């Protein structure tokens, strides 16, 4: 009996049937919004009325907008500070990677920030920084110093928000490093110890190379976290004081939602998307080269 079409092509068609729902979902909820945002960025539009074609006008305005310049500088500051998370997490991970009951209990406490919502983190640190009843000013009073309205100071507010953001970021990187430390090659470490490797030499030449995958992922997620920073800015300062803490993601939302400038907000979203795309492409190329043994 001659096989029907399905029997003859089952191995080829089965993957198509399984992938089609995911492809449709991706097209509707990812690709369509991306191209819609790109199209809207060429218009001046309040989200309700007629759309006025302005071409690259929004991008030219962005180039000359001081608030966008401030947002970019703040994103760079976030990036620099977030790159402190991997080394701090590594140092903390080495300290916590001990077979002591007290350390095991402390380890669970360090995981806590990772599971806390960013909204909760923002509220906790807002209360902590409060100049009237916050713990920060209680410590300053014990030291004989004047109260400090950290989030109201345009020179210090960024650092206050970044410190709050680093709390869960360090916890996430810590999990990566503890996983990497648990998977270290014990035989290699023992061989190096027999050969006389100790202290810094042991760490730099034996332990750190084995933690390379964890370090790579920690750096990648830290950079992405810095570029996508929005929630804590929105919760703690709303971009203030006087726009000094705004970042690209927050500026995008403020222009599109609060100022009713959908086109300008879409232009900001497009630029942020391109920056993230370039970085993600670099990341994927690095992963591919690493798998091929070219790194």
Located regions from the model:
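A structural signal for multi-pass alpha-helical bundles of membrane permease subunits
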Residues: 5-295
């Amino acid at each position: 009996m001659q096989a029907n079409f399905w029997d003859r092509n089952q191995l080829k068609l089965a993957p198509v049937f399984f992938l089609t729902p995911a492809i449709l979902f991706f097209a509707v909820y990812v690709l369509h919004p991306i191209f819609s945002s790109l199209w809207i960025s060429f218009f001046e539009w309040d989200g309700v009325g007629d759309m006025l074609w302005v071409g690259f006008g929004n991008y030219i305005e962005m180039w000359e907008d001081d608030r966008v310049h401030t947002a970019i500088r703040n994103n760079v500051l976030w990036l620099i500070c977030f790159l402190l998370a991997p080394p701090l997490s590594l140092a903390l991970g080495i300290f916590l990677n001990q077979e002591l009951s007290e350390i095991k209990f402390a380890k669970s406490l360090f995981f806590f920030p990772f599971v806390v919502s960013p909204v909760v983190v923002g509220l906790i640190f807002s209360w902590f920084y409060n100049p009237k009843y916050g713990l920060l000013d209680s410590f300053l009073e014990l030291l004989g110093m004047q109260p400090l309205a950290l989030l109201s100071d345009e020179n210090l507010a960024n650092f206050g928000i970044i410190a709050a953001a680093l709390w869960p970021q360090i916890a996430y990187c810590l999990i990566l490093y503890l996983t990497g430390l648990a998977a270290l090659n014990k035989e290699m470490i023992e061989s190096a110890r027999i050969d006389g490797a100790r202290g810094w030499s042991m760490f730099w030449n034996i332990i750190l190379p084995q933690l390379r995958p964890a370090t790579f992922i920690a750096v990648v997620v830290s950079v992405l976290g810095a570029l996508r920073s929005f929630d804590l800015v929105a919760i703690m300062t709303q971009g203030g004081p006087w726009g000094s803490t705004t970042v690209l993601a927050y500026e995008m939302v403020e222009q599109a939602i609060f100022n009713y400038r959908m086109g300008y907000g879409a232009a900001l979203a497009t630029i942020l998307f391109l920056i993230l795309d370039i970085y993600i492409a670099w990341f994927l190329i690095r992963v591919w080269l690493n798998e091929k043994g070219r790194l």
